[in-house]
Regions:
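N-terminal active-site segment of His-dependent metallophosphoesterases
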Residues: 1-34, 171
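Short, structured patches in soluble enzyme cores that scaffold and shape functional sites
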Residues: 7, 85, 100-102, 112-115, ...
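A short, polar/charged loop-to-alpha-helix boundary motif
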Residues: 113-127
Length: 245
């Protein structure tokens, strides 16, 4: 099986981000990828840098307009796709959600992020309710796929429970980076810690790990984060199979 993780640099235009994602999916498919994963909340800049009520308008239902687009794309290309979306479950309840779409164009799994951060410029608790669907592993025609999201990475129980459910590979759509003022003092150790925790999940659970991050500076008002990229795939022995810059 050949997988692809698509590291992206987001812009302020939702339409441009969507077009960029679709273009990169097509390129990955042309290179033989059968399972493809997009970064966390790839449609927009990382809006969780600020607490702003108007950002709730970015959320959508699942199934909804964006998932419908990717369902059609999966059916066309005969690929399996993991898509991270800002989900509106119902009035006042929103989730950070990852769906798995199979090659027939059907949504076969939905995972809602369980661990929600509330750190400076990662104000996700303002937006997201913790997941209510439990941990997920779904059998596909290619491989058993586990889905976790970003901050779930720092909790070994999440990877263990997902692997116990049968996952052979765990995908982590991610949005993580440096506060510019902290990068000089802590940047190297922060990145190394992030790499180490992914490797430990692979080794401890005997699974493949694929973490896909966004990359680049993102400024919202007076707030700035530098997303560090370094999307990475590990085999069950902790060897790096692929790593972006």
């Amino acid at each position: 099986i050949k997988i692809a993780i698509i590291q992206m640099r987001m812009v302020s235009s939702r339409v441009k981000n969507l077009k960029n994602a679709i273009n990169k999916i097509r390129i990955a498919h042309q290179k033989g990828a059968q399972v493809i994963c997009l970064p966390e909340l790839f449609l927009t800049n990382y809006f969780c840098q600020v607490e702003k009520h108007s950002n709730f308008k970015l959320a959508e239902k699942i199934p909804g307009p964006t998932s419908d687009i990717f369902c059609s794309l999966c059916k066309e290309l005969k690929i399996i796709l993991l898509v991270s979306l800002f989900e509106k479950k119902t009035a006042g309840i929103y989730h950070n959600t990852c769906i798995v779409i199979d090659k027939t164009g059907k949504i076969i799994s939905k995972y809602r992020k369980m661990h929600i951060p509330d750190d400076p410029q990662y104000y996700e608790k303002f937006y997201f309710t913790p997941g209510d669907l439990g941990f997920k592993s779904v059998k596909t025609s290619k491989i058993n796929i586990g889905t976790l999201i970003c901050w779930d990475q720092w909790f070994p129980e999440a990877a263990r429970l997902t692997s116990i459910l049968g996952a052979e590979i765990i995908f982590y759509p991610t949005a993580i980076g440096w506060h510019p003022k902290e990068k000089k003092a802590y940047g190297k150790s922060q990145l190394e810690s992030w790499i180490s925790i992914q490797r430990s999940h692979a080794i401890a659970n005997g699974v493949y790990i694929a973490a896909v991050n966004r990359v680049g500076l993102e400024k919202i008002g007076s707030k700035t984060l530098e997303f560090w990229g370094n999307s990475i795939i590990f085999d069950p022995s902790g060897n790096i199979l692929a790593r972006a810059k």
